[in-house]
């Protein structure tokens, strides 16, 4: 009987714990083995033979806090830190506890929960560059912001960068010239779609002549505008770039589709049907309303206590929107990436779905991309938004490991990586 009891206790211990830090014997990571997965931890972090207040960070193999990463949280001898699907960034090997007095302790993250970055397809997700629109800190703030972001992706070894539209102020040719200059000579391809500010350029064919012509290694749709990128060949994962082909601010035209029902919708549906067992990333400019039909509950939007919300979603109930919404309910292997509202990552405080959600499994995962040039900010009682160009410049670095996707939010200006907004998808 004693042997059976001992065996049971060993099994429970293997499932529910452990990795107590032997380095400096400072902290202990207790892992719930049933709820933790590759790339994310559930359980708790506690102090071991220590007292006082400590701040937790992700660290490297030597127990040094990863540079630029925001804190995980706080801990003291009476209150362990509860991990609820704590996403592990690609470079993390340890969790570090530090005090203001200089005391630092760390514990190793169990290796079975670490993902091998060498096996990942790494891509950046940017939006709303807006050349020629903002000049707070430079002759053209977008030139500085976009080039800085691309330099960041060069440094981390990105394989591709996708942009969710609005390259220009109003479809002007000079914006596309600046865009092409910025992406020229990069070690990775940069692909984009049209935004509402770019629509004029599409209408007069300037887009195809200046942007589409530079897209190589992709399969174009019959309209010569939309295209698919296959990083591992046509039988694997796919990136679909879906463009706005009409846009109007007029109340009388708000029910007119921005995506062609007869051309673009069948093209997108064909890709989705052909890749039900693969990851499908869809880049599109406009964000969707929430499941309740409200703009402010969708991924990509919010409403602050003062009542402000960004007023221009992908119009709920339009014929194109209904079809695409149905796709996103049916094909849960899709990751939908959009921009348009510019909201900074921090604005998630007004809507927990602002940055990322699948609405409890009702839809595919949706991702909001802030503006790389002018992330927007709003306080509780503000009735207008504030542009943070020159102060913030944000986007995502996304690691596709094959069966897991880790999304890492970045501010390119400061080099900050937002630990609290990291997300994970298990395919």
Residue ranges of model-derived segments:
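C-terminal motif of bacterial Sec signal peptides marking the signal peptidase cleavage site
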Residues: 18-19
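Beta-strand-rich modules
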Residues: 86-103
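Active-site neighborhood of phospho(di)ester-bond hydrolases with catalytic His/Asp-centered motifs
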Residues: 125-127, 160-166, 190-196, 282-284, ...
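Active-site-proximal segments of metal-dependent phosphoesterases and phosphodiesterases across multiple
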Residues: 138, 252-259, 275-338
């Amino acid at each position: 009987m004693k042997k059976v009891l001992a065996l049971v206790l060993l099994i429970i211990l293997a499932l529910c714990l452990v990795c107590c830090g032997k380095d400096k014997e400072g902290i202990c990571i207790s892992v719930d083995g049933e709820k933790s997965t590759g790339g994310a931890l559930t359980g708790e972090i506690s102090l071991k033979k220590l007292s006082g207040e400590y701040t937790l960070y992700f660290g490297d193999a030597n127990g040094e806090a990863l540079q630029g990463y925001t804190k995980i949280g706080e801990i003291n001898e009476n209150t362990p830190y509860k991990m609820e699907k704590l996403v592990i960034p690609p470079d993390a090997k340890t969790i570090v506890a530090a005090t203001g007095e200089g005391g630092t302790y760390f514990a190793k993250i169990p290796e079975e929960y670490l993902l091998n970055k060498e096996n990942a397809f790494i891509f950046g997700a940017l939006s709303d560059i807006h050349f020629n629109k903002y000049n707070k800190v430079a002759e053209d703030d977008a030139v500085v912001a976009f080039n800085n972001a691309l330099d960041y992706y060069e440094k981390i070894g990105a394989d591709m960068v996708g942009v969710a539209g609005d390259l220009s102020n109003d479809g002007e040719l000079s914006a596309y010239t600046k865009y092409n200059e910025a992406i020229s000579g990069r070690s990775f391809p940069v692909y984009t779609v049209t935004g509402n500010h770019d629509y004029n350029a599409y209408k007069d064919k300037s887009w195809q002549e200046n942007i589409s012509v530079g897209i190589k290694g992709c399969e174009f749709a019959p309209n010569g505008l939309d295209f698919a990128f296959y990083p591992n060949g046509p039988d694997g994962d796919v990136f679909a770039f879906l463009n706005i082909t009409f846009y109007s601010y007029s109340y009388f035209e708000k029910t007119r589709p921005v995506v062609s029902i007869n051309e673009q919708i069948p093209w997108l549906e064909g890709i989705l049907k052909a890749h039900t067992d693969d990851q499908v990333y869809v880049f599109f400019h406009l964000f969707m309303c929430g499941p309740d039909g409200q703009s402010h509950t969708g991924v990509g939007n919010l409403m602050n206590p003062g009542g402000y919300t960004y007023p221009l979603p992908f119009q709920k109930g339009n014929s194109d929107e209904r079809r695409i919404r149905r796709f996103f309910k049916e094909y849960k292997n899709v990751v939908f990436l959009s921009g348009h509202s510019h909201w900074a990552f921090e604005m998630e405080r007004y809507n927990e779905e602002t940055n990322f959600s699948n609405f409890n499994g009702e839809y595919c995962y949706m991702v909001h991309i802030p503006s790389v040039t002018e992330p927007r900010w709003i306080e509780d009682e503000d009735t207008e938004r504030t542009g943070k160009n020159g102060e913030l410049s944000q986007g995502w670095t996304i690691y596709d490991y094959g069966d897991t996707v880790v999304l890492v939010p970045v501010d390119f200006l400061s080099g900050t990586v937002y630990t609290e907004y990291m997300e994970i998808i298990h395919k």
